[in-house]
Regions:
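Gram-negative outer-membrane beta-barrel transporters
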Residues: 1-68
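Extracellular loop and loop/strand-boundary signature of outer-membrane beta-barrel proteins
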Residues: 26-32, 73-80, 129-134
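Residues that define the transmembrane beta-barrel architecture of outer-membrane proteins
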Residues: 37-41, 84-88, 138-142
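C-terminal beta-signal and adjacent terminal beta-strands/loops
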Residues: 60-67, 93-150
Length: 150
């Protein structure tokens, strides 16, 4: 068989060093610098042997912070920090007649969701999970796929 291992890592650090007066409020500067996790990684294992194959992918998102935006004081004094998360995806496939492939899999198979939204106004407006989450809030997604190569 053949095993491919791939690791990718992002280190993000945004620093706004100069803001023209009254261009944006301090809360927006805070959000631009902190709403993206400082670290995120993807580790993928892709195995194939003959007609069978499979993929396991582990996604990591570091914690991130945000302000209430329009609903806060605007000076960056009120912030919320949301925790880090690990998501796992899995997929298996079988190829036959050298052109048809049947695949089953799942994304976020442990049904992880972002932390609950801390801002009361956004919660009142219907936001259950952090609206600035770096990943979706719909939980697990399962699928089956049939494909053909011509």
């Amino acid at each position: 068989g053949n095993l491919m291992v791939d690791w990718r890592h992002n280190y993000n650090q945004q620093d706004i060093s100069d803001v023209k007066s009254n261009a944006i409020v301090d809360a927006r500067v805070f959000d631009l610098e902190n709403q993206v996790p400082e670290n995120s990684s993807v580790l993928t294992f892709d195995y194939s042997k003959d007609s069978f194959g499979g993929v396991v992918r582990v996604n990591y998102y570091d914690e991130w912070s945000t302000t209430p935006g329009l609903f806060g004081p605007g000076d960056g004094s009120v912030t919320d920090t949301y925790g880090s998360t690990i998501l796992v995806d899995i997929e298996a496939h079988y190829t036959f007649d050298d052109r048809y492939t049947i695949t089953i899999g799942g994304e976020n198979i442990f049904d992880e969701t972002p932390d609950k939204e801390n801002d009361g106004t956004l919660g009142f407006l219907g936001a259950v999970y952090a609206v600035t989450s770096p990943f979706g809030f719909n939980g697990a997604f399962w699928y089956a796929r049939v494909s053909a190569s011509f």
